């Protein structure tokens, strides 16, 4: 399954580049289940090894891709979760082993994390500093959940929803700089 998906991602990336489009390469290891952070590390590492092998085999210019992976994190059913600092350290350690320095940027999936978890984990990674890639976010739920809840489909809630969305975007922007702090949350 990993090989087939990696092959498909590489073909997609090559076709994008042939058409002057920057491919978003998204090899996601799901956080569903009771796996430990160490198991996620192993599977993420193996997945990325296969993906980059296929990208190279297909002649993809790694300087012209955007990598959109998961963070190395405990499964959703694990009750004693790893700290954000541990998640950051494990994620960066894993990526330093397998993600070539030619890759200019990594934009993380939130993968089901809460808004605060995703922001704090990204912030902790950027606080490590001196990384060969720019680390940012490509969150769905972890960027939009508060805004959607505030809006609730009602026109009269649009301003409140917009403020909630802008706040989350600002918090994640600060996290990309390693300058987020829990005290900034409302």
Task: Identify what each model region corresponds to.
Residues 1-53:
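Helix-rich catalytic cores of soluble enzyme domains
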Residues 35-186:
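Active-site capping/gating regions of soluble enzymes
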């Amino acid at each position: 399954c990993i090989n087939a998906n990696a092959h498909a991602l590489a073909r997609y990336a090559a076709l994008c580049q042939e058409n002057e489009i920057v491919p978003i390469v998204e090899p996601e290891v799901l956080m569903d289940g009771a796996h430990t952070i160490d198991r996620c590390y192993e599977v993420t590492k193996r997945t990325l090894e296969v993906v980059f092998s296929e990208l190279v085999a297909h002649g993809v210019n790694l300087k012209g891709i955007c990598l959109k992976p998961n963070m190395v994190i405990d499964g959703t059913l694990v009750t004693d979760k790893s700290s954000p600092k541990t998640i950051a350290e494990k994620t960066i350690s894993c990526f330093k082993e397998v993600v070539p320095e030619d890759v200019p940027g990594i934009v993380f999936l939130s993968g089901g994390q809460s808004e605060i978890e995703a922001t704090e984990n990204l912030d902790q990674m950027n606080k490590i500093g001196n990384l060969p890639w720019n680390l940012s976010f490509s969150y769905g739920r972890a960027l939009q959940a508060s805004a959607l809840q505030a809006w609730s489909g009602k026109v009269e809630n649009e301003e409140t929803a917009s403020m909630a969305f802008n706040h989350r975007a600002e918090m994640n922007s600060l996290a990309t700089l390693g300058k987020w702090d829990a005290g900034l949350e409302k």
